[in-house]
Amino acid sequence: MKNAVASFGLSKRRSFLGIGLAALLLTACENVAVHNVGVHTAASGTKLEARQVVSLIYKQESLDGLAELAYSGGDLSRAIKRSYNRFPELKPHFERGLIGNTASGFVAVRESSQKDALKQLLRDENTDRAYIYTQTSVAVGHGNDTLSLWEKYASFAFGKEWIAQAPAGWWAQDEKGNWTAR
């Protein structure tokens, strides 16, 4: 009987050791998996936010869609609203080809003769766009030491959407500074 109790105790210790080792391994796997999912989710979240924000602004439908965005609230929503409200003023300049969207997600002047007249309007729009890209980066989990890298990713993700969703005839500037009509 003594041997049976001793072997049960040894067996119990092995079980606990096995469970502990399994838990350690699962924890390590979970951290890797969570990290990989986090990176994937941040990229997908950024692209989704870009698609939704650009669509909301270009379509100029109800701002009720603001609550439907993947990431919204507070100052981010206010920046999106300002861009939404400013768009009717920008639209004729896009349509005449005086301004265009850049690959990096900003608005630039195509016709230098209009630069002074459009300076403040574009400064306001680009300030809000930069803020949207920063806040989207923070919202997807890159608000720490990776913020500056992720802001660049976000600005180009948004830039792609500004260009892709623009009507035919609007101008876009690529990363090399070349302009093409959509």
Each model region followed by its residue ranges:
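C-terminal motif of bacterial Sec signal peptides marking the signal peptidase cleavage site
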Residues: 25-28
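Start-of-domain marker
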Residues: 36-51
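Alpha-helical interaction segments
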Residues: 19, 118-123
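Short, well-ordered alpha-helical segments
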Residues: 121-138
